[in-house]
Amino acid sequence: MSARPSLGSGRILWGRSLAWLAVLGPFFFLSYGFANSQAAARGEVASLYFEWEHAIPFWPWTIVPYWSIDLLYGLSFLFCRARRVVDRHALRLLTAQLIAVLCFLQFPLRFAFERPAVEGVFGALFDALAAFDQPFNQAPSLHIALLVII
């Protein structure tokens, strides 16, 4: 018996995978945006951090792996070659999203550190992120949860 779960065999289920992405993509942006706007409307939102975290350096290039999860999210469906596997994968992603958004709504936490100014390609990526993201999703880390599933 293999320790790795079977992804199924055969062809990529394009229709089913794209259908799930057509549901999960908009759901992500709508629910995530809703949670952020609700937290912003609260006014004062707490932060949770340790003093030693101020010593962690800011590396602008880390925006690239951060953004890469969006690509990996979509590509992850190409590894699912059975209907049951596609559905299970999509439901795991949906569950992580629901849990994170519920936490963001119930216990919003604001990022306490201001990002330094960044220019060039990395600056453009940070600007694109800032166009739809607000600092009210400190915990749980939805990116890490999705990355573990992917």
Model regions and ranges:
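N-terminal transmembrane-helix/juxtamembrane module of multi-pass inner/ER membrane proteins
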Residues: M1-L72, L109, A117, F122, ...
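Membrane-interface loops
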Residues: N36-W52, C80-I150
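Short gly/ser-rich anion-binding loops that grip negatively charged ligand groups
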Residues: F58, L75-C80
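Hydrophobic alpha-helical transmembrane segments
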Residues: I63-S76, L91, L146-I149
